[in-house]
Regions:
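Bacterial Sec-dependent signal peptides at the C-terminal "C-region" and cleavage site
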Residues: 3-29
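Short catalytic-loop micro-motif centered on adjacent basic/acidic residues
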Residues: 41, 68-71, 140, 208
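Short Gly/aromatic-enriched secondary-structure transition segments
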Residues: 48-49
Length: 229
């Protein structure tokens, strides 16, 4: 009789636990969207910075982030603004990395287009506002390099520094985290490019990242993700 009572009690406890488990929802993964140009578009491919970041996260035994790329080759800051409703806001992200600026500078030389600094700042701030109005956390990224010479002799170094300062100033005034890839790349090239090569250290063609360049971006962004609350 005692055994039957114990069995009945254990059965009830088991049923209760199963019922409780059915009401417990798994933790929702934080959705992070990386919003940018061809560097971000390639970031989703093998060896890309988003793919490498996903591997870094999994190596730490973490499984509560969902990484998505929203990069399109050739995009400038106004392209991002025009497509952000469809490519970003509709997906309800928790965090968005804004990583744009290379084409705004580079295309002035290669295509005769580009984006003037004042217009760049206006569109950049407009993107931020649309995100923060939706309570989406934002991380800003400075552009990396157009040419890897470490003595500031690359043609667009001056403009890269100018546009990076625009981003840094916005970040400071609005208390937004900034992933300062420009500074990180400059420091790395000063220490690891003794022959002052134009490409091949962190990029394949002066602009688009090789595996090492992608890894550095992944590492820097992952550090910031862990601090975003």
């Amino acid at each position: 009789m005692l055994c039957r009572k114990n069995f009945f009690t254990l059965s009830c406890i088991f049923i209760l636990l199963v019922a409780m488990m059915s009401f417990i929802k798994p933790d929702k993964k934080k959705k992070i969207i990386f919003f940018g140009d061809s560097i971000t578009q390639m970031g989703m491919k093998p060896g890309g910075y988003i793919t490498q970041m996903d591997s870094l996260i999994k190596k730490e035994g973490i499984d509560n982030y969902q990484l998505e790329g929203a990069g399109i080759g050739g995009n400038k800051v106004y392209d991002l603004y025009l497509r952000m409703d469809t490519d970003v806001l509709s997906k309800n992200p928790d965090i968005v990395f804004i990583y744009v600026g290379i084409n705004d500078i580079w295309h002035k030389v290669t295509h005769g287009t580009g984006t003037d600094p004042d217009k760049y700042e206006v569109f950049y701030k407009a993107i931020i506002k649309k995100l923060t109005d939706r309570n989406i956390k934002v991380v800003l990224c400075t552009p990396t390099v157009i040419g890897e010479r470490n003595d500031y002799s690359n043609q667009q170094d001056g403009e890269l520094n100018m546009y990076s300062n625009i981003i840094r100033n916005i970040a400071q005034k609005q208390s937004i985290p900034v992933c300062d890839l420009r500074n990180v790349f400059i420091k790395y090239l000063q220490e690891n490019n003794p022959t002052n090569q134009e490409k091949g250290i962190l990029t394949t063609d002066r602009v688009h990242l090789n595996d090492k360049g992608n890894l550095i971006v992944a590492q820097q962004m992952w550090k910031l993700i862990k601090d975003v609350r």
